[in-house]
From Swiss-Prot:
Name of the molecule in the record: Large ribosomal subunit protein bL20
Pfam families, per the entry: Ribosomal_L20
A cellular component annotation (GO) from this entry: ribonucleoprotein complex
Function comment: Binds directly to 23S ribosomal RNA and is necessary for the in vitro assembly process of the 50S ribosomal subunit. It is not involved in the protein synthesizing functions of that subunit.
Protein family membership: Belongs to the bacterial ribosomal protein bL20 family.
A GO MF term: rRNA binding
Native source species: Geobacillus kaustophilus (strain HTA426)
Domain of life: Bacteria
Keywords associated with the record: Ribonucleoprotein, Ribosomal protein, RNA-binding, rRNA-binding
Database matches in InterPro entries: Ribosomal_bL20, RIBOSOMAL_L20_CS, Ribosomal_protein_bL20_C
Gene that this sequence comes from: rplT
Amino acid sequence: MPRVKGGPVTRRRRKKVLKLAKGYFGAKHALYRVANQQVMKSLMYAYRDRRQRKRDFRKLWIVRINAAARQNGLSYSRLMHGLKLAGVEVNRKMLADLAVNDQAAFAQLADLAKANLNK
């Protein structure tokens, strides 16, 4: 059986990698071996950081809610507990948006939480 060289397949695979490496600095965008290493590393970073982004946004929302809660005389944990006791099902993303864009509505929720904490 004759030897089969993978010409078209190899070329296609290498073109795909170099296309993904577009915009990289130095040899990383032009040389296949270096580009392949960087593309693999970049894809790993992308996979990891798609999960990290969800954690980062949750942290940001909590920081914003805590700052607004303290302006209304509550800590973050007491605000969340009070809202839970009141049966308010507003998620952290919506609360953070209210804290930034509609302080009056957030203050009403904080007052509701205070009232339910004192029961």
